[in-house]
Amino acid sequence: MTHNFAENYDIIVVGAGHAGVEASLAASRMGCKTLLATINLEMLAFMPCNPSIGGSAKGIVVREIDALGGEMGKNIDKTYIQMKMLNTGKGPAVRALRAQADKALYAQTMKQTVEKQENLTLRQAMIDEILVEDGKVVGVRTATNQKFSAKSVVITTGTALRGEIILGELKYSSGPNNSLASVTLADNLRDLGLEIGRFKTGTPPRVKASSINYEKTEIQPGDEQPNHFSFMSRDEDYITDQVPCWLTYTNTLSHDIINQNLHRAPMFSGIVKGVGPRYCPSIEDKIVRFADKERHQLFLEPEGRHTEEVYVQGLSTSLPEDVQVDLLRSIKGLENAEMMRTGYAIEYDIVLPHQLRATLETKVIAGLFTAGQTNGTSGYEEAAGQGLVAGINAALKVQGKPELILKRSDAYIGVMIDDLVTKGTLEPYRLLTSRAEYRLILRHDNADMRLTEIGYEIGLVDEERYAIFKKRQMQFENELERLDSIKLKPVSETNKRIQELGFKPLTDALTAKEFMRRPQITYAVATDFVGCADEPLDSKVIELLETEIKYEGYIKKALDQVAKMKRMEEKRIPPHIDWDDIDSIATEARQKFKKINPETLGQASRISGVNPADISILMVYLEGRQKGRKNIN
């Protein structure tokens, strides 16, 4: 078919949420002529739900995005109203940063970045059709019948894909925050042969700040100690004039109001059909599932410095409006609350992610990539991480360069993508630290050490940033070597000073590095005895040193496991293998292999329902094929 294209691009990104922004910025920064098309320009990088970035596991993802050359970390560092390190009382593997965002400023600042980006065109347009010829993407068609050509297309439509808002007895076509839904494109994706699922998510009501009695709530301040998402942000730029959040709780009256109105709750009346998020349930779902609980936490989170809107975290609901008002006013501190926006649920179509490769390219259509909530995930950070990987791989494909696949041992982003393409998901997928088997080496403090080199090689990390990274890397390696070479001896003067600090005296000589392995010995304490490095160390280098030294044994064990798994990850499975040709594998394994078409032996081993015996048989089969080829040659 001949198309009359209005404009020609290398890459077109459909949707400008958190996934679409990262995808389009990555592609354009890698030199590809890119179009970012979105239904509404005012909603670029908009936060339709929580006004925050980061949190458990998610905060580590933001640092990974930053280390690879993405934008989310830089943007939130410019626009936060509160910053807090979570899980400080736990081990380093689960610590993560979380920021309250100035919601409007975050979107506005990101829009300015996109508008100024070279090679990137921003267009308000509804995309109705992905144009495909001979199994390959060739472009898109808009609702106004404009056609644009592209060598790759990235779909990042979020919850707009056949979106429907549900509120009490009401159900109507809509994207998030009452934006337009994308219905024709949803039909088009199904027609192209993609399997489509249906998920649901929700958001809580917003209340007016001046109507809250804060004296009845508990203040939740940010951290005084500087922390940042971007490794390029400076401690001296840390915002100290932070805005607090506030803690309150539901109570028995709140629960009674919900229980008395369950017949009007879409979750229980049958109106909601989509599968909701396990780790972010609605308040009505929590009351029913955890009936023994007398109260549930609610955090009152300001949506910015220049707005009265306050997000009631923990009160996601699709109950009718009148019930929401009664529910709010049953809560301590909210007795006179004015509801500015109602909570609601939203159902939307997703592309079932087992149809994707680890590059996030679809297996059905060459050059078509999907990312974000379109793939069945929840959360801005998960979306941004996928968008970055999809944008990078779309650009690499256009340029004819090797693809980027992040392994489970490389990044939480790699864990997430592997989970999606290998196991699929039956509910909105959320990243958790428990999903990562190598979480001690996937920490927030070493994201730059893990990924900056990759970002530099693909062209997203510039020379200035790379030079700063190399300097930090050298500082870390030199200081580690120095600490391992200096001895502390159990002489009386040294032990006296150690005891004065409240620590146990030395019984044997040991290196400064060994001394730092003691739980209570920080880098600052150690350098009191052995002196400082020749030049002052970056605070991020000191944090990295302390973690790497104290957990050295555990980290080494994790790296040994990675090395063993690497052999399986490097064993490729031919793309057009005939699974019926392999004798003796279990029926369930054969069915799963046919459905997912794993690309490596390692991926095959992680498919649910596949046992070690199946993998052994597959390994023997692959080795036999390889020997057969050698004999033919």
UniProtKB/Swiss-Prot annotation:
Belongs to the MnmG family. Keywords: Cytoplasm, FAD, Flavoprotein, NAD, tRNA processing. It is found in: Cytoplasm. NAD(+) binds at residues 276-290. One of its GO terms (molecular function) is flavin adenine dinucleotide binding. It comes from the Bacteria. GO terms for cellular component: cytosol. NAD-binding protein involved in the addition of a carboxymethylaminomethyl (cmnm) group at the wobble position (U34) of certain tRNAs, forming tRNA-cmnm(5)s(2)U34. PROSITE patterns: GIDA_1, GIDA_2. NCBIfam families: mnmG_gidA (TIGR00136). Its main location: cytoplasm. Homodimer. Heterotetramer of two MnmE and two MnmG subunits. InterPro entries: FAD/NAD-bd_sf, GIDA_C_N, MnmG, MnmG-rel, MnmG-rel_CS, MnmG_C, MnmG_C_subdom, MnmG_C_subdom_sf. Pfam families: GIDA (PF01134), GIDA_C_1st (PF21680), SAM_GIDA_C (PF13932). This is tRNA uridine 5-carboxymethylaminomethyl modification enzyme MnmG. Its cofactor is FAD. FAD binds at residues 15-20, 127, 182, 373. GO terms for biological process: tRNA methylation; tRNA wobble uridine modification.
